[in-house]
Structure formats: C-alpha cells, structure tokens
Amino acid sequence: MTINSIYILNKAGTLIYQNDFGNTEKLSHNSYIRLGSTFHSLHAIASNLSPVSGSSSGIEVIETEAFKLQCFQTHTGIKFYVIADPNHQQLEELLHGVYELYTDYVLKNPFYEIEMQIRCDLFDYKLNRLLGVRE
C-alpha cells in the first residue's frame, strides 16, 4: 500500500510542508500551493456546513477509486493530510505519527519559526523512516 504525498498546512491555510513518495508525478511549486489552499478552503466550508452548530471539524476523509485523502487537524489549526492508495487502512495512525515527528523535530528546533516553511533534514529523515522509504 502506497503513500503518495504528505502535506502540512498552517492555520491560515499556507502550505508549510509537502513531500512526494514513490513514483508520484512531481508538480510545480505553484501547483502544490494551489492544492494546499484548495484543501484548506474545502475543509473550512465543510466545517461550516454542519446543521448542528460546532459539531463539524471539516473534511476528515475523501475516498475515490484512485486515491484516499485523510486529514488530521490539531487543536492549534495545523492540518496534516496524506494522499495514499485507496486500500490503505491505517492513515489516521500514520498522521498521528507524522504529528509526533512534527512536535519532536520541527517545533523543538530552535531555528524554526512558527507558521513558516519546514526545512528540517532530521524531520525529513525521520518521516522517511516512519514511511519505510529507503534513502
């Protein structure tokens, strides 16, 4: 079962991290930004569509025949989402693992500025290990 991409958006909807895995076709930088802002907008709209006030947290899963998208949003508004093979079953656990790596290797990095692009080699390395990607 294949993980295609992982995206991290800050609370304003700005793409702060993106990584493709396997044979995923690479897009232009602007296309990645467009995908991130589109998902952020859809997530915000979905969270406001609930007939019961305050009961919706937005989009959590989108499933198609071609892919499965799973989202995890933190209490601070950071969104982690993964695009994977439609048969992949443990994406929620994977996203929690990515969140743990984010807190351990990005937020604790003294050179990282909150809400800015993530450029941390140790985070990339640990993420690749989590996903079983060979260097």
Curated annotation (Swiss-Prot):
Chief site of localization: Golgi
Biological process annotations from GO: endoplasmic reticulum to Golgi vesicle-mediated transport
For this protein, the record's CDD domains field holds: TRAPPC4_synbindin (cd14856)
Q: Which InterPro entries match?
A: Longin-like_dom_sf, TRAPPC
Q: Which UniProt keywords apply?
A: Endoplasmic reticulum, ER-Golgi transport, Golgi apparatus, Membrane, Transport
Indicate whether Membrane appears among the record's keywords: yes
Q: Which GO terms describe its cellular component?
A: endoplasmic reticulum; Golgi membrane; TRAPP complex
User: Where found, per UniProt?
Assistant: Golgi apparatus membrane; Endoplasmic reticulum
Q: Which cysteines are joined by disulfide bonds?
A: none
Entry similarity comment: Belongs to the TRAPP small subunits family. TRAPPC4 subfamily.
**Assembly and binders:** Part of the multisubunit TRAPP (transport protein particle) complex.
What this chain does, per the record? Answer: May play a role in vesicular transport from endoplasmic reticulum to Golgi.
Provide the protein name. Answer: Trafficking protein particle complex subunit 4
Kindly list the organism's lineage.
Eukaryota, Amoebozoa, Evosea, Eumycetozoa, Dictyostelia
